[in-house]
Structure formats: structure tokens, C-alpha cells
Amino acid sequence: MSQPPKILLLYAHPEPQDSVANRVLLQPAQQLANVTVHDLYAHYPDFFIDIHHEQQLLREHQIIVFQHPFYTYSCPALLKEWLDRVLSRGFANGIGGNALAGKYWRSVITTGEPEDAYHADGNNRYPMDDLLRPFELTAAMCRMHWMRPMIVYWARRLQPDVLSSQARAYGEWLSSPLPEEER
């Protein structure tokens, strides 16, 4: 049996102390040897990102997980800055920019609204797949494989047993994220 692939979990929450759901989701990840949890707000409170360090982390991992709350149909500001600065031309895209080609991208997102708010007749007027399209396109621009996102809807209002169940499922996926033939 082969080793599980190395996973870089980029965690971006500007107020982690207030996030019950993300704290619970991170617990299984922090126990796994194949997962590097990288808290962007803890590392870069001033938003001055060490681009070379971040690019080296990306080179060292096969799967990149972006875990964050869904803010204004996107991600928190520091993660957006990270995407714009770290996934640069010549590294992740453009001529010679193939450092991430063939790697995997998975978004793990918590929302403040129920799942039925994300459809044509819902509060947000679009399904979540449509709202996540910019992330999917960014993965494609970097020649990465887009993996089905994990969405935790109405995160603050979930019953503890439901949230624990989702965290267990997340931990199981992190333990074995790819079929054997893709490792």
C-alpha cells in the first residue's frame, strides 16, 4: 500500500476564534502526518506574503486544499491576495508556469446560509457550483485538477453531531484523497 499524497491545507479565516465549524473541521487534519495545515492569517497578519516560501510549499505537496468561509461570494481578503500574488505568471501559469500542473485543488468552504439559499429561487440566485466558478477557473489556469468541493452549509447552526460527522468524513478524505491508481 502506498503512502497517502502530501496535502497542503491553506486555512484562511480572519477570525478563527469565532469559527466553531472551521475549528472542528481542522481537528482531524491536524492529526494526519500527510497534511500540512498552513494558517494564512496566523502567518501573515500584516498581509505581507512571503511568495517564495508559499511557492515552495506548493511544490512540496500534491493536493492543495483551500479551507475558508464563503465571504461575499468569494474568499477572505488574505486568501484573495495570496491567490493573486503566489499563483504568478511563470510559476503557476503563463509561459513556463507549470509548477502546479497535474496537482489537485479542493475547496472546503463554510457558509452562513442553508443549502437551499444557493439556487435560482434562493437568496443568492445561483447554485454554489456557479458561485465557485472563479476558483475552478483559477485551478484550470494553473493546470490543476479541480476536485469536487466540500461545502458545509449553515455552519454556525449545525447540530454538533452533524458537524462532527462532517469533520470525520473530511478526515477520512484527507487520509485517502485519491484513488490508489492516482497516487
From Swiss-Prot:
CC per GO annotation: plasma membrane
Pfam families associated with the record: Flavodoxin_2 (PF02525)
GO function term, MF aspect, one: NADH:ubiquinone reductase (non-electrogenic) activity
Catalytic activity: a quinone + NADH + H(+) = a quinol + NAD(+); a quinone + NADPH + H(+) = a quinol + NADP(+)
Keywords, in A-Z order: Cell inner membrane, Cell membrane, Membrane, NAD, Oxidoreductase
Tagged with keyword Cell membrane: yes
Membrane topology label: Peripheral membrane protein
E.C. designation(s): 1.6.5.2
InterPro entries, A to Z: Flavodoxin_fold (IPR003680), Flavoprotein-like_sf (IPR029039), K_H_efflux_KefG (IPR023947), KefG/KefF (IPR046980)
Annotated localization: Cell inner membrane
Keyword Manganese part of the UniProt annotation: no
Broad EC category: oxidoreductase
Subunit note: Interacts with KefB.
Protein purpose: Regulatory subunit of a potassium efflux system that confers protection against electrophiles. Required for full activity of KefB.
Similarity comment: family membership: Belongs to the NAD(P)H dehydrogenase (quinone) family. KefG subfamily.
Protein name (Swiss-Prot/TrEMBL): Glutathione-regulated potassium-efflux system ancillary protein KefG
Organism, as annotated: Pectobacterium atrosepticum (strain SCRI 1043 / ATCC BAA-672)
